Amino acid sequence: MILARDDKWTLGSIALIFVLLIGFALLFLLERFRVKEKSRTFKDCVNVYQCPSKGERVYLALRHWFIFLATHKAQMTLILSPLVMLVTIPFTGKETKNSIASYDWNLTGVAARLGYLSCGLFFVSYFFSLKNNPFCLMLFSSHEKMNYLHRWLSVYAVLISVLHGILFMIFSAQSYKPLLYDKISIYGYFITVVLFLMTVASLPSVRRKFFEWFFVLHHTCSVLIIFLIWLHHPRTIVYMKACIIIYAFDRGCRLFRSIWNRSNFRIYLLNEDMIYMVGRKPKRSFFALPWAAGSHVYINIPSLSYWQVHPFTLASAPFDDFIELFVAVHSGFTERLANRLYSMPHEYPNFSLAPGTPESLSNTYRELNSFKSYAVEIENTAQGHTYEPEDLYLETTVFMDGPYGTTSNVFKEYSYVLLIAGGVGFSYTLPILRDLILKECNVTSITFIWSCRSLSLLKVASKSLNSLLHQSNVRLKIINHFTGSISCKESSEFSNQTTENSEMEFFDDRPDLDMYIQKFFDYVGYQTAALAACGSQSFLKRIKNSVNKSISSTTDIYQHYEEL
């Protein structure tokens, strides 16, 4: 299909979006170079604090505003929405010749142009939903960060398409055109119904509560939209072909990776609300993407369901010969997996390490192999029973798509790093910590804060943290806050430790985030710093509020938040 003259405006809007992103990617590369050079200079000249110049102060102030908006999506949406609408106005094409009704104020011309524009935005929205997105590689970021663009471009596309339909209905009513049995109108009504279903299913409250239903409905409606718009008008076919090509390419790559990375996983139930999984590292292939610490994979367990795929954060790093996952048990897929573990009859297995097992095998896995020496008490008085994790294990085939995530560990470029996690969120911050300690970087000081209420999880993770404590060549402070119903200090395994330049502490209360973040900013001074946090929505909100209260205009800090 040859593009018509009017399509130039739609192509112009698509090009504008991509050009802006390419420009942003170039600025991001320049920022990384600036941070790397500043951190390298500081590392070579320890304890040399230079006050930022006037130009750097202005730059940091502008950067703070950008980071604030990037980490507060609601405020960014309020600012960007009217700007996007203003930019959209020129692309509606009021100068378009009205060949249908010359007496009209160009109503049909504007309505048609809005239809083309919405098709173009649907294509861009599909593009940013791809797991295999080239902009992720350019920005050293995860496809999850593109979801913001995917969602809001979809919203704008829906609003513009609805306006397109309303204008044509007004014209049809004025011109006494058929509204109910016209072919184009009928497909338009079907498109409206499907878009309404997608909008309702995509609401945050609905999406979180019924994620599995949302996943199925969202993808089904996405395919329906393509074919309905295809049938709606012949001039839209070229845009829908583009959507089909990129959608099929992405799905094909993911399917190939899932089959290629099929392997046996050993799955343990640490306690009533925590699952541990360990398996073979993903194979290298032409379709594999580069990944770094803090990445995630999509897991499918055929013995539970062939159709359900769920994302989980990797607690291992790229240089490991294995991958491990810590999974919190919620309703749905993870609950069924936990019930499967409960229902299986077990005898205590003798997990001797097979010949050729790498020495780098995780402390977690080795600790599980020796877990028989003690029992974990479930903190549930209604149950009142104890069990040992080895008695609740499963070995099964897993299809694994990924890993996906950042292509490099950006935290390596900063002088000071603060890692904060709540609960199973430590599976995101732990591999970053390991990567910073075991690999060469510009970091001179790391603070690791973790709040946890699971005693068994704390015991398993403390082995890895203790090992890192004695391997660290930089200043390392590990702070563990146990929020369970009993005291972790009753066990001799959770004792404070100090080495030449590192220390690890245990506390039986909630962390005072305001105090920790303020101390970190005071310690950083004018040098480069990075903060990474992972936890629940409320946990991250507390951290963001603490950062906003403590940050100054000269603080040179990068912030990254991962919501569980």
Swiss-Prot record:
Annotated FAD-binding FR-type domain residues: 254-410
Binding site for NAD(+): 419-427
Membrane topology: Multi-pass membrane protein
SUPFAM superfamilies assigned: Ferredoxin reductase-like, C-terminal NADP-linked domain, Riboflavin synthase domain-like
Keyword annotations from UniProtKB, A to Z: Cell membrane, Electron transport, Endoplasmic reticulum, FAD, Flavoprotein, Glycoprotein, Heme, Ion transport, Iron, Iron transport, Membrane, Metal-binding, NADP, Oxidoreductase, Transmembrane, Transmembrane helix, Transport
Binding site for heme 2: 164, 232
Binding site for FAD: 310-316
Catalytic reaction list: 2 a Fe(II)-siderophore + NADP(+) + H(+) = 2 a Fe(III)-siderophore + NADPH
Transmembrane portions of the chain: 10-30, 66-86, 110-130, 152-172, 184-204, 210-230
Compartments where found: Cell membrane; Endoplasmic reticulum membrane
GO cellular component terms listed in the entry, alphabetical order: endoplasmic reticulum membrane; plasma membrane
Pfam families found in the cross-reference section: FAD_binding_8, Ferric_reduct, NAD_binding_6
Family under the similarity heading: Belongs to the ferric reductase (FRE) family.
Function field: Metalloreductase responsible for reducing extracellular iron and copper prior to import. Catalyzes the reductive uptake of Fe(3+)-salts and Fe(3+) bound to catecholate or hydroxamate siderophores. Fe(3+) is reduced to Fe(2+), which then dissociates from the siderophore and can be imported by the high-affinity Fe(2+) transport complex in the plasma membrane. Also participates in Cu(2+) reduction and Cu(+) uptake.
Protein name: Ferric/cupric reductase transmembrane component 2
Organism: Schizosaccharomyces pombe (strain 972 / ATCC 24843)
